[in-house]
Amino acid sequence: MEENTKKAQQQTENVIGKENKIVTGVIWQQLLLFFFPILFGTFFQQLYNAADAVIVGRFVGKEALSAVGGGTGTLIQLLVGFFVGLSSGATVIISQYYGAKRAEMVGYAVHTSIAFSLVAGVGMMIVGITAAPWALRAMSTPEDILGPSTIYIRIYFLGVIGNLIYNMGAGILRAVGDSKRPLYFLIVSCLTNIVLDIAFVIGLHMGVAGAALATILSQALSAVLVLWVLMRTKDMHRLELRKIRFDGRMFHRIIRIGLPAGLQSVMYTSSNILIQSSVNALGTDTVAAWTAYSKIDSLFWMIVNAFGISITTFVGQNYGAGKMDRVHKGVRTCMGITAGATVLLSVILYNYASICYQLFTTDAQVVVIGEQILHFLVPTYFTYIAIEILSGTLRGIGDSWLPMIICCLGICALRVVWILTAVPLKNDILTIVFSYPLTWTVTSIAFIVYYLFFSRLKIVGSKR
């Protein structure tokens, strides 16, 4: 214990000697400096699945395209998204302790987080492999893609532990203000994934199995790289293998903050499973169009999620440092920048919808359905901005339960009600996807009201 305390004191002294620009620099510059590495990192992370979709869609067929997206993507997001939500608790805790220069607590949080990743990875692997066929059938997956979908999802979960370790490790690095190295690792692993996709799918004719194998090998590489950096750093977030274990109190703190985000992710995905089931009932062409749309749509989510992660770390460190004025200014600045980026992206996607779809498939009917979806949803993207930025802000100060409830009621529950009541009256793709802008608008209004008048952040800010 004495040795740990001395190390923590030395690491704290090292950090005190460095200026933390997140709590002292120009706000919009710090947000953008943090945002761009996260954006590019998310872009390359999305390329894992996008590369699978493009290569199998172009060289195997629309059934294979449906198998690597659609229901499989939703099920993967259900489990992995729950873990990523839980791990956000570690990011918040570490950013607050790092901002307050409490080295020993940062160390406990880092080692507990990695231990959690290992245990969760084993559990998720077992659940994913055994439950895949049942879950896909429960989603009304068309029979012609049930077999390849099962193969893809089982191989993916066989190597899911690499994904979890990378996400946790990258979250630790971002919590201390390092968003560049996670980007570099993703670039390397993404390029590896593309090369392996070409080799396995085109060269060895392994189909969806080759695409899944390429993905898990590439994710394992990114996990190794992020662990290597954590083990070599001299800062207070240094990882030592012999210290990887659960600290009960720290784990409780991480889960207390992360569980709402994890449950929120599960509720999101559960409602999306219902939507996916409704889409599946419309046939393979619509499933393929929806799968391709989800890849195109990921451009928006990359941008808005990157800003959400940026504001969480910005708020967490400034809140830990007691700088409430910077917290509020940061929120306003982040909202404005996100709105501008969303409008620009929406204009581009709307005007080049056909070209976007032709990257994924040459099937004319799939392209027609896809354009219809894209033209309907893209103009409504702006209605989601407040949800991401304000929920990220509130997570940054540890206020996560009520935002989770707002999302579960405003997005998930309302979405389910819409699908169960409106879709039977008019069962087409536009009726199904209208559930998105409807729920985004309602939930954004609720978040704005909560943030301005009732949130703990507003109460704390008004007292200083």
Q: What are the functions of these language-model segments?
A:
Residues 1-35, 94-159, 203-259, 315-380, ...:
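Short alpha-helical transmembrane segments in multi-pass integral membrane proteins
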Residues 24, 28-47, 51, 75-82, ...:
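Residue-level signal for short hydrophobic patches within transmembrane helices
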Residues 33-52, 155, 166, 189, ...:
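Transmembrane helical elements of multi-pass membrane transporters/channels
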Residues 43, 47-66, 136-143, 199-206, ...:
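Helix-terminus/linker motif at the lipid-water interface of multi-pass membrane proteins
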Residues 45, 49-56, 80-87, 91, ...:
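Alpha-helical transmembrane segments and their lipid-water interface positions
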Residues 56-77, 143-148, 208-209, 250-257, ...:
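Interfacial/gating helices of multi-pass transporter permease domains
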Residues 65-126, 163-182, 289-353, 384-407, ...:
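Small-residue-rich hydrophobic transmembrane alpha-helices
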Residues 87, 155-174, 182-190, 211-226, ...:
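Short runs within selected transmembrane alpha-helices of multi-pass transporters and secretion channels
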